[in-house]
Regions:
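Conserved, mostly hydrophobic/aromatic
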Residues: 83, 149, 307
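Mobile, glycine- and charge-enriched loop segments
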Residues: 151-152, 181, 262-287, 378-404
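Flexible, acidic/Gly-rich N-terminal and inter-domain linker regions that tether
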Residues: 2-131
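Canonical Radical SAM [4Fe-4S] cluster-binding loop centered on the CxxxCxxC motif
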Residues: 131-168, 219
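C-terminal accessory regions of radical SAM enzymes
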Residues: 332-404
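Conserved AdoMet/S-adenosylmethionine-binding subsite of the radical SAM
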Residues: 171-185, 194-339
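Short, charged beta->alpha transition segments
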Residues: 124-127, 137-140, 170-177
């Protein structure tokens, strides 16, 4: 009898080990059924949006109460049940809490702060489209988010209670893009594009894909972190139809990467969507090397490459959340060379007033002239690299090479 051939191993996608990944379900919503909890629309309907609701679950400080009262007239307050469960109820310094619970300091405008720190309104040729860079545009498809970050650079237009209304003229945008053949890259943002229904998002992507010179599409989203239930198999299958399509997610602290978020990111990655992360450097959230190192390592385990670390924009009322640029450089220097290169994000400042992203790096070039570059490596050691080739030398004479 012939021996049975060994069965080939079955290859399956594996989630990263459960170490460091936790679920906080159901938390404050113990009465929710599993079906309700996993329904992204249920999550949106049950967001915490008022001072009274927040006080039911958190021991609020006086400055938090004052900050919550301010949200009737500026950037709204709203947190999904999934994300609210991550907040430490008795710790006002909780890094999750600092990102979404407003403080009275939001009413204090310090020198240099602006309503539109990135100068987007001045680069908006048609309503809802920002054309600041030569070959790419920012398409603001909605003014709503799953939860509202207190450092939001578009707080003037996001959430419906800001200083301005977002007025996006979709047909005028499509006409502009048809005409401007230099545009090869469109980034969908807002607000958050993934809050749109599958059908609405498909309609936008279809119109963009019909424009021949647009090479690839991007979506910037915090939904996989605030509302991982939205990342359904149906959504992923639809997005897969529009490749090449990339996605930038927004994670600031390792605790945000729960088991549900890990699984949502895995579904996007399995759909062939390259994932990058954009963090904002925030005081009391991620402004130390250990926290940032834990975050970037955890992101890589979720198949997300750390892409940008932003200096917090000079948005009105953000002084209590901003760090010094020196702190950002210190963090990058603590990472560069000490961990995987793929894990180290590029530290950037969005130049105030509309200058665009400017990369900021520690001083690894000590000296540079026409003869040489003097370099400092991550250990502080000094090296020289010649700018011009020296005198030629021949290691092997051509006539000595045997012809076989």
């Amino acid at each position: 009898m012939r021996a049975r051939e060994p069965r080939a191993p079955t290859l399956t996608a594996m989630n990263p080990p459960s170490r460091d990944f936790r679920s906080h379900t159901p938390g404050f919503w113990a009465d929710a059924t599993e079906a309700e909890w996993n329904d992204w629309r249920w999550q949106l309907r049950h967001r915490i949006t008022t001072l009274a609701q927040a006080e039911q679950h958190l021991r609020l400080t006086p400055t938090e109460r004052e900050g919550l009262l301010l949200t009737a007239h500026k950037l709204a307050f709203g947190v999904t049940p999934h994300y609210f469960n991550l907040i430490e109820a008795d710790n006002p310094d909780c890094p999750i809490r600092r990102q979404v619970i407003p403080l009275a300091g939001e009413a204090v405008i310090t020198p240099g702060e602006m309503a539109d720190p990135c100068g987007e309104d001045g680069h908006m040729p048609v309503p809802g489209l920002v054309h600041r860079y030569p070959d790419r545009v920012l398409f603001l498809v909605t003014d709503r988010c799953a939860s509202y970050c207190r450092y939001c650079t578009r707080s003037r237009v996001v959430s419906g209670v800001g200083e301005q209304e977002l007025e996006t003229d979709f047909e005028e945008i499509y006409a502009y893009l048809q005409k401007h053949t230099e545009v090869r890259d469109v980034l969908l943002s807002g607000g958050d594009a993934l809050l749109l229904s599958d059908n609405k998002l498909r309609a936008i992507l279809t119109r963009l894909r019909a424009i021949p010179h647009i090479e690839f599409l991007r979506i910037g989203s915090r939904v996989p972190i605030f509302l991982p239930q939205r990342i359904t198999p149906e959504l992923c299958a639809m997005l897969k139809e529009f490749h090449p399509l990339w996605m930038s997610v927004h994670v600031n602290h390792p605790r945000e990467l729960t088991t549900e978020v890990r699984d949502a990111l895995g579904r996007l990655a399995d759909a062939g969507i390259p994932l990058g992360n954009q963090s904002v450097l925030l005081a009391g959230v991620n402004d130390n090397p250990d926290t940032m190192r834990a975050l970037i390592h955890k992101l890589l385990r979720c198949r997300v490459r750390p892409y940008y670390l932003y200096q917090c924009d000079l948005i009105h009322g953000s002084a209590h959340l901003r760090t010094s640029v020196a702190k950002g450089l210190e963090i990058i220097e603590a990472l560069r060379g000490h961990t995987t290169g793929y894990a180290v994000p590029q530290y950037v400042i969005d130049a105030p007033g509309g200058g665009g992203k400017v990369p900021v790096s520690p001083g690894y070039v000590v000296y540079h002239d026409n003869e040489k570059v003097v370099l400092r490596n991550y250990e502080g050691r000094i090296f020289e690299y010649p700018e011009k080739p020296g005198a030629p030398s021949t290691l092997v004479r051509p006539e000595t090479i045997l012809d076989y």
